[in-house]
Amino acid sequence: MSSILESIVFTSPNKTILYKTIHMQQTITLKYIEQIIECEYHRVLRNNSGCFVSNGTMGVALFMIWYGKNFNKVKYVEDGLSIIGVKCTHLTSNDSLDVHKGQVGIALGILWLSLSGIIQMPISGVLSHIDDNIFKKVSRISDYSLNKNLDQLLDVACYVALRLKYRSCTAMDDKIYSRFLSMLINYIYPDFYKMLQEEVYPGGYSYRLPRFIYLIQASFGNNFDNRLIRIIEEVQPLVLAQFPYMTANRLALANSIRLLAHTQHLCYRWGKHATMLVDISVPF
């Protein structure tokens, strides 16, 4: 698409007008985005909107930091970091665990800031308070309430897998986190077949199957690889028979399969199925 645009611009007699039009549209768009950022920034400062990723402080702050970093707006990076420091330090054990409106989302946000090089400090200490709350809350989930808490457990497991994958915890904690992750996968896996039967609307992150596949992919390298390989072999016929109706769900599933195929030697049918999920379209 960029080459087509360049050919139009550089061969057009009105290239100056085109340049000005493109620049004007970009300027208007950026100004509009910055107006929204300012409104959201003052909203989270004024109100107790929660410090979470979805409609909360962490979500606003992460976007401000991303925008400032990518468009050389240092002010937005600094303001985003400042509101995280002010608003995201008052977490309680009663808060939810999920990504959108829970502690896992905050922890993943901090992990992203560290991996992106935006915060230059060890994050094990920063995340230890959140981790303590997560461990305590998971330990209180009974076998009878596993089904009700499946989404939260799936989010927690993905978070722990990423902590281990990116070595963001101390060597002493590695063994504890690895055992905790193995326990979570053993909790979640029996409900795998229910995940296959449920396609959420309108789709996207709430679709559990891609998250489960991503969890398996991210969990390799933690002393229970043989268990993960057996899980892949067991679920292969069922996963390769899935064709979600919603486009967002098909793309999410295809992406998770490709991530797994990139790191593990899988039957060729996995890659073929991922391609089919992307290429074949249905009305929605």
Question: Where do the PLM segments sit?
Answer:
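Glycan-recognition and catalytic cores of secretory/periplasmic carbohydrate-active enzymes
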Residues: 14, 20-284
